[in-house]
Amino acid sequence: MGLKFPSSGQFLSIDVIDGPDVVPAAKRLLKTHSEDGGVSVWDSSSIFFEMHGLEVSDRPSARTLVLLYAADLCFRLRWEIIPALEGGKCVVAVPYIQTGFAFGAVAGLPQKWLTEVFRFAPNATESYRLNGTSSRKLGPPTSGFIEFCSTTLNEDLRPKFATYFEDLDRRGRCRPL
């Protein structure tokens, strides 16, 4: 990919279950780490916003959704995250790569393929998870990647994502917020 990741700044990530929880959680985390920084949120490139409402008879495959997520993430890295880090700022990326891995695992995609797709994305210095309340009504498809995929696949995927993130926590790969 050719993305040069700076050594300056502080890079944090949060993977969340409910899209509406994204910005408040990211702002709280940012305040605990820095007075100067920003938040990079899902669908900055508008890929998913543009896809929502398209009238097509075929639903995109799980691989297509992962590739689109990776493309959006690459856009965010190139145009939002890396420039802020180069300026010495703290950046909270929400969601980040574990959401892509979680969706791939839930959809039964090979781990090796997922690792190859996301190899361009560096690990965050600190990774967090935020499990929402799955008793809450599923948000609109434009509120988050999990909501978009759940709507596209006609299945509420939040419980499966929560299980995936809890397993990451048990293995020390992220911490709960």
Could you tell me what each predicted segment is?
Residues M1, L77-W79, T115-R119:
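A generic local structural motif
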Residues M1-S8, L12-D15, D21-T32, R136-L177:
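NTP-dependent small-molecule kinase module
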Residues S7-S8, E86-G88, A124-T125:
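Short loop/turn elements that form and flank the Walker-type P-loop nucleotide-binding site
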Residues T32, I82-A84, F120, D167:
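Alpha-helical scaffold elements within enzyme catalytic domains, especially in hydrolases
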Residues D36-W113:
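ATP-dependent small-molecule kinase phosphotransfer cores
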Residues F75-W79, A124-G132, F165-D167:
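Low-complexity, flexible helical/coil segments
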Residues Q98-K160:
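A glycine- and Lys/Arg-enriched "phosphate-lid" helix/loop adjacent to the NTP-binding pocket
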